[in-house]
Amino acid sequence: MSYGTAAGVAALAPRYANAAGRFDENTTPKLAHVTDWLAQVSAMLDVALSGYGVETPVTVAAILPMLAGYANAQVAAMVRGVNGQGRFAEKPTTADEMLLIIGDATAAWVTKNIGGLGALLDVTPVTLATPTVTIGSFTRRDGYSSDGSEYTA
């Protein structure tokens, strides 16, 4: 299930849609690309949400407009980007590079909003595991050995 629609993307990036306000085979990008990108961004949302214990795809009416708006906005940014405009225009960026950037942004967006999303979905978000690095110290046991046995952990 995709969040957002090609019509929603066209509403945010009307310059790149046809005269009827739709993407088709003659627009850049084509409708098929917009549809694929919506599915990919939606999958990114689902993966990020499921990492917090949220059942996906989300079907709760109170949340769907927010997820659709996010997907539409990210795909509209891609539409502008492939046309050399918008936030991806600063340096040449390919569609696959844009998707990687959007993937990172999606994870951050879900992390920022998971408290409210979890409350509306009646889910207690799980805490993601954070790796812990422990740095030890060494104490010299004697001043004369040289085979490495002079240190204890």
Question: What residue ranges belong to the model's regions?
Answer:
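Conserved short "hinge" loops at termini or chain/domain junctions
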Residues: 1-66, 121-153
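Internal mixed-charge
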Residues: 36-122
